[in-house]
Every structure is written in structure tokens, then in C-alpha cells.
Amino acid sequence: MTDHQLLSASGLGYDLGTRALWNGLDLVVARREVLALRGPSGAGKSTLLRCLGGIERPHRGVVHAGDVDLHHVPARVRRRIRRDVLGFVMQDHAIVPEWTVGANLRVVRPAGVTRATLDARARDALLVVGLGGRSRERAGQLSGGEQQRVAVARVLVQRPRVVLADEPTASLDDVSAERVRRGLDALRRSGSAVIVATHDPGLVEWADRSLEIGVEHV
């Protein structure tokens, strides 16, 4: 996997009933690069992220994580790539409310990482997102904005090559939104590529470039 092409897509198309949601879509992201996906609600930004992450299959085209064709490999290989290469920050947080904050962070344990290293990463990640010292709190007792910060901290612990973030600052208060942005920037500075679907002008300005979905790709 080269720095010049951590994740790429070629000729992607996705149909919603008889309508093409998008078609002929190409993109490439490299190390430390941020790509913002823009477009109106319903344009298919979230669907595109799921296709790029191997969660959903596009109707046309290919997605490569490095040199691996993500949708034409055995499920076990795709799971390994999602564990070690791709990180996700989705709108629903994907937080287990009954678990502690720390347990939610440790659920993503990359291959070869010891428990001691995982714990150290978790402490550092919580400091970055402004939740230092709260690892023993039950995640379900946190506010929605704080839970989104935990989701970002979890990706900081994982340290993936590519981060896929779906409206990570939507409906957050100013403090939580800024902490989420800070966490995403820490990921970029550590070497991750970031693809973020967003309406947040701050995130669009932060990105190296943007791609308008639902305009030139139909």
C-alpha cells in the first residue's frame, strides 16, 4: 500500500430504484490528505462512504484499499481490512451504552497491539477529544456530543490508514464540534487520510479538496 494511493475508487455507480444516485465516480486519497464530500441531503454521501468502507457494495465500479479490491475478496479479508486499515466515525456513534468509555475504545484492537499499548493510546485519545480521566464512566450516561467524541477517540486508538467520517459534527454543540475537528486533525497529522461527508463549512475549509456528490456524477 503506497502513500500515493491509500484508498481509490474508479467508475463507481449506485442505483436507487430506477434512478442513478451517482455514476462514474472516481477518487483517490493519499497519506495525510483530507477529502470533503459535499452535496445536498439525499445525494448519497453516506452510501458512498459505506461503499468505500466495504460495508455496502456499489452497483458498478471498484474500490481498492491499497492494491486490494475491497469488494472482490473473501469476507475474512474484508473484515481484516476494516479492522487494520479503515476507521469509521458514523452518525450513530456505534457506541455500546452499557460499556464504559474505556471498553468502547478497546474494542478496536489492531493486530499486534498489546493491551498496555492499547490502554496508553486510549488515555492519549481521550485527552485529545477533551474527555481525559473519564474512561471508567458508562458511555450511555454521556451526552450525544460526548459520545461522538468517544467515536473519534476510538479511531485515534485504532490508528487506521484511512478514516471515513459521516457528518461527524452534525447537531453537536460548539465545544463538541471543535473537539471532533481536533481529533480528526490529529488523525491527519499522524498520517491517516480522511474522507469526510459534511455540511460543516469548517471541515470543508480544513479539507485539502472537496468532491461535490450528486452534481457531476449522475
Indicate where each model-derived feature is located.
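Conserved ABC transporter NBD signature motif
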Residues: 61-69
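ABC ATPase NBD coupling module
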Residues: 70-86, 189
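Conserved signature/switch motifs of ABC ATPase nucleotide-binding domains
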Residues: 113, 137, 157-158, 190
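Helix-to-loop junction immediately C-terminal to a conserved catalytic motif
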Residues: 53
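ABC-type ATPase nucleotide-binding domains, specifically the catalytic core motifs of the NBD
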Residues: 106-119, 128-129
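Conserved ABC ATPase signature
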Residues: 138-142, 146
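Catalytic Walker B motif of ABC-type/P-loop ATPase nucleotide-binding domains
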Residues: 163-166
